[in-house]
Amino acid sequence: MSSKRFTKDHEWIEVDGDVGTVGISDYAQHALGDVVFVEVPEPGRVVAKGAEAAVVESVKAASEVYSPVSGTVTAGNQAIVDQPGLVNEAAEGAAWFFKLTLSNPGEVADLMDQAAYDAYLKTLE
């Protein structure tokens, strides 16, 4: 069972201690289509829960990636900047967008687990 938590905007976060890894869901990458550009935040940037933290562009649309929790960015994934198509191949794995140190770990509890997210996706069909 995945320890990922999801937002209604289709971001995911996986938390290890006080560090979270953030990306977009497989549903989101599928909806976007072929990803052609990614912008990730710089380390040291402070982001608030729900605030724009990254950008993903596809042949169909440009979309913001929002931070699911508040914290300080510790790393951006240069691999997806160099090869945006990785987002389509491994959205919920190697194609994470950024890592951050959580400033309020309690915010994670407000997010959906995999089962709740799957149920939410069914309401969008």
Curated annotation (Swiss-Prot):
InterPro entries reported in the protein's UniProt record: 2-oxoA_DH_lipoyl-BS, Biotin_lipoyl, GCV_H, GCV_H/Fam206, GCV_H_sub, Single_hybrid_motif
Modified residues (N6-lipoyllysine): 60
GO biological process, one term: glycine decarboxylation via glycine cleavage system
Pfam families registered for this protein in UniProt: GCV_H (PF01597)
Lyase recorded as keyword: no
Cofactor(s) needed for function: (R)-lipoate
A GO-annotated cellular component: cytoplasm
Superkingdom field: Bacteria
Domain Lipoyl-binding: 19-101
Cofactor binding note of this UniProt entry: Binds 1 lipoyl cofactor covalently.
Sorted UniProt keywords: Lipoyl
Sequence similarity: Belongs to the GcvH family.
Function: The glycine cleavage system catalyzes the degradation of glycine. The H protein shuttles the methylamine group of glycine from the P protein to the T protein.
Quaternary structure (record): The glycine cleavage system is composed of four proteins: P, T, L and H.
Protein name: Glycine cleavage system H protein
Organism: Paramagnetospirillum magneticum (strain ATCC 700264 / AMB-1)
